[in-house]
C-alpha cells in the first residue's frame, strides 16, 4: 500500500523535481538516482585571455565532469560558456536561482532594459506560480533574484509582484528572515500607489505581534524610516492606545521602535508637514505621559521615558511634563526601583533649573522623617542598592556646576543653591562615613564629596562681591561729569 504523502507543487526539469514545503520556508532539490551522478555545478568567474580588464561578471565557466572514485584524479573539464538565454532554454533557471553561485550569475546578467525579451521571460518564469515565487522569497539564495526583480520592476511588474506577495501570505513573508528583505525593498522601490496598497495590507495585521517579533519589526522600521508620515498614521494611532503602547514598549525590540517613531515625528520643524506631525506626536506623548509610571518601572519600556527626558527641541515640553506630572512626589519610591532609578537619574541631569530645584528639595525635605529609625529620604537612598546611584548623580550635578563645568555661566544666586545642596549631602555622607565605607558604592560617594577645588558658599559670596576697582569703574560710568571737573 502506498504511504500517504503531503501534496506539493513540483517542477520537473532535466530529470529533477523541486518540492516546496507548505510553509514555503525552503526549497529542496531531489534528483533521480543513476549509476554515474553528475557532480554539483561549480560557477567560476572567467576572464578572457585577450582582455584581462573585462568584468568578472561578463562570462562564467561551468566545470563539470563524470563521477570518479576517491583515488582517481578526473581529467580537466573543458570550459563551457553559458548565457542567460541558454539557462532559460535548458530549463535551469530555478536551479540557478537556488544555487549560491547561480543566483549571482542571474543577478549580474538580468537585463536592465524593461523591453528585453529575455528579461520578460525570466520574470514570467519566476512569477508563473505563487508557490514558486514565495518559495524563492523564503530561500536563502532565491530571495536575491526576487530582490532584483523588485528593484528593477516596471509599474506593471510591481503590481504583479505585489499580487504574488499578498496571495502568498504577506504576514508570513514579513516574519521570515529572507522573505522580509523582499518586503522591505518593495517598500523602498515601489511607486506610491503600489506602496500605498502594500501599507494598506500591512495595516490589517496584528501590529503588536509584528512589533515584538525580531524579524517582522524590520518591516515596520522600514515603514517608519523611509515613508512619509501620512502613509503610516494608522501606526501612530495604534501606539496611542494604552494597551498597545505597553505591549510594544515592554518588548526589547518594540521599545526601540517607539523611540524611532518619536524621533521621526519630532524632526525638522521647518518642513511644511510639521504641524501635522506635531498633532500625531502630541497624541502619542499624551498616552506615554499617562502611562509614565508603569513604563518607567519596566525593564525595556524605561528606555522610552529616558529617551524623551534626554531629547531636546520640541520634546523639552514633554520632558518637563513627565517630570512634573509623573516623577515629582514619587522620587523616593522610583529611586528605589531597579529600572525607574535610571529615569530619575536622567531627570536630575536634564531637568530645567526650576524643576531641578523642586526635585532637590523633595529629596531633602519632601518626606516625613522616620522618627523610630531616625532616617529621612537622603539616608534611605544613601544605603539603597539602586537609590545610591541617584545620590551620586545629585552630587555630580552640584560638583559640575560649582567647579564651572556647566555649559552656561551660572549667576552667583544659582551657584549658592548648588552649594547649599552640595553641603547638605557632604555633611550627611561624612556623618555616615563609617558605615558607607563598607560598600563599594559608599566609597565612591565619599570620594565624590571629598574632591578638592569645590568652592564653598563663602567663596562664592566673596567672588560675587565687587572689588574696590570694580566699584570705582561703576562709579565713573555713572557720573562721568564729576571726573571732568
Swiss-Prot record:
Coiled coil: none
Disruption phenotype: Simultaneous knockdown of puf-6 and puf-7 results in ectopic primordial germ cells (PGCs) outside the somatic gonads, premature PGC proliferation in L1 larvae and germ cell death. Does not affect germline development in adult hermaphrodites. Disruption with puf-5 and puf-7 results in abnormally small oocytes, disorganization of oocyte nuclei and cells, inefficient yolk uptake by oocytes, embryonic arrest with impaired eggshell formation and cytokinesis defects, impaired repression of glp-1 in late oogenesis, and mislocalization of rme-2 to the cytoplasm instead of the plasma membrane.
Annotated transmembrane regions: none
Gene3D superfamilies in alphabetical order: Leucine-rich Repeat Variant (1.25.10.10)
Biased composition (Polar residues): 55-68
Keywords assigned: Cell cycle, Cell division, Developmental protein, Differentiation, Oogenesis, Repeat, RNA-binding, Translation regulation
Record-level GO BP terms: cell division; germ cell development; mRNA catabolic process; negative regulation of cell population proliferation; negative regulation of translation; oogenesis; post-transcriptional regulation of gene expression
Region of interest (Disordered), ranges: 29-48, 55-76
Residue ranges of Pumilio repeats: 86-124, 125-163, 164-200, 201-236, 237-279, 287-324, 326-361, 372-411
GO terms, molecular function: mRNA 3'-UTR binding
Region (RNA-binding): 439-454
Superkingdom in the source lineage: Eukaryota
GO CC list: cytoplasm; nucleus
Pfam family, one: PUF
Miscellaneous comment: Puf-6 and puf-7 are >98% identical on both nucleotide and protein sequence level. Experimental approaches often do not distinguish between the two genes, which are collectively referred to as puf6/7 and are considered to be functionally redundant.
General function of this protein: RNA-binding protein that binds to the consensus sequence 5'-CUCUGUAUCUUGU-3' in mRNA 3'-UTRs and modulates mRNA expression and stability. Functions redundantly with puf-5 and puf-7 in oocyte formation and organization, early embryonic cell divisions, and repression of expression of glp-1 and other maternal mRNAs in late oogenesis.
PANTHER family: PUMILIO DOMAIN-CONTAINING PROTEIN 5-RELATED (PTHR12537:SF26), RNA BINDING PROTEIN PUMILIO-RELATED (PTHR12537)
Protein name, per record: Pumilio domain-containing protein 6
Organism: Caenorhabditis elegans
Source species taxonomy: Eukaryota, Metazoa, Ecdysozoa, Nematoda, Chromadorea
Amino acid at each position: 500500500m502506498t504511504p500517504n504523502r503531503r501534496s506539493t507543487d513540483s517542477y520537473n526539469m532535466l530529470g529533477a523535481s523541486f518540492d516546496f514545503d507548505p510553509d514555503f520556508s525552503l526549497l529542496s532539490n531531489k534528483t533521480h538516482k543513476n549509476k554515474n551522478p553528475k557532480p554539483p555545478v561549480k560557477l567560476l568567474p572567467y576572464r578572457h585571455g585577450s582582455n584581462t580588464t573585462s568584468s568578472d561578471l561578463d562570462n562564467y565557466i561551468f566545470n563539470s565532469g563524470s563521477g570518479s572514485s576517491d583515488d582517481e584524479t578526473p581529467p580537466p573539464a573543458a570550459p563551457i560558456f553559458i548565457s542567460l538565454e541558454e539557462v532559460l532554454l535548458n530549463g535551469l533557471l530555478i536551479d540557478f536561482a537556488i544555487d549560491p553561485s547561480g543566483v549571482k550569475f542571474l543577478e549580474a546578467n538580468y537585463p536592465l532594459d524593461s523591453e528585453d525579451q529575455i528579461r520578460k521571460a525570466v520574470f514570467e518564469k519566476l512569477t508563473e506560480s505563487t508557490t514558486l515565487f514565495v518559495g524563492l522569497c523564503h530561500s536563502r539564495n532565491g530571495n536575491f533574484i526576487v530582490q532584483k526583480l523588485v528593484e528593477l520592476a516596471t509599474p506593471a511588474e510591481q503590481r504583479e509582484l505585489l499580487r504574488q506577495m499578498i496571495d502568498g501570505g504577506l504576514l508570513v513573508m514579513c516574519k521570515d528572515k529572507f522573505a522580509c528583505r523582499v518586503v522591505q525593498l518593495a517598500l523602498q522601490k515601489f511607486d506610491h500607489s503600489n506602496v500605498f496598497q502594500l501599507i494598506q495590507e500591512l495595516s490589517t495585521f496584528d501590529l503588536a505581534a509584528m512589533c515584538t517579533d525580531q524579524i517582522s519589526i524590520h518591516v515596520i522600521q522600514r515603514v517608519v524610516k523611509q515613508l512619509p508620515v501620512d502613509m503610516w498614521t494608522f501606526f501612530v494611532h495604534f501606539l496611542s492606545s494604552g494597551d498597545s503602547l505597553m505591549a510594544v514598549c515592554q518588548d526589547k525590540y518594540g521599545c526601540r521602535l517607539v523611540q524611532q517613531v518619536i524621533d521621526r515625528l519630532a524632526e525638522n520643524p521647518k518642513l511644511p508637514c510639521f504641524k501635522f506631525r506635531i498633532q500625531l506626536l502630541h497624541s502619542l506623548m499624551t498616552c506615554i505621559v499617562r502611562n509614565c509610571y508603569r513604563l518607567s518601572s519596566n525593564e525595556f519600556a524605561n528606555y522610552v521615558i529616558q529617551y524623551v527626558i534626554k531629547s531636546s527641541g520640541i520634546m523639552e515640553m514633554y520632558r518637563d511634563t513627565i517630570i512634573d506630572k509623573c516623577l515629582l512626589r514619587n522620587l523616593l519610591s522610583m529611586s528605589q526601583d531597579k529600572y525607574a532609578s535610571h529615569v530619575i537619574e536622567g531627570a536630575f541631569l536634564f531637568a530645567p533649573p526650576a524643576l531641578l530645584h523642586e526635585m532637590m528639595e523633595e529629596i531633602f525635605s519632601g518626606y516625613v522623617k522616620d522618627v523610630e529609625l531616625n532616617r529621612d529620604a537622603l539616608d534611605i537612598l544613601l544605603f539603597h542598592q539602586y537609590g545610591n546611584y541617584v545620590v551620586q548623580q545629585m552630587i555630580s550635578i552640584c560638583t559640575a556646576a560649582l567647579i564651572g563645568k556647566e555649559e552656561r555661566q551660572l549667576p552667583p544666586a544659582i551657584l549658592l543653591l548648588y552649594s547649599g545642596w552640595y553641603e547638605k549631602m557632604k555633611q550627611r555622607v561624612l556623618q555616615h562615613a563609617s558605615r558607607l565605607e563598607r560598600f563599594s558604592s559608599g566609597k565612591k560617594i565619599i570620594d565624590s564629596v571629598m574632591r578638592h577645588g569645590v568652592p564653598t558658599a563663602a567663596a562664592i559670596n566673596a567672588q560675587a562681591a565687587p572689588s574696590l576697582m570694580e566699584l570705582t569703574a561703576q562709579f565713573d560710568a555713572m557720573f562721568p561729569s564729576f571726573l571732568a571737573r
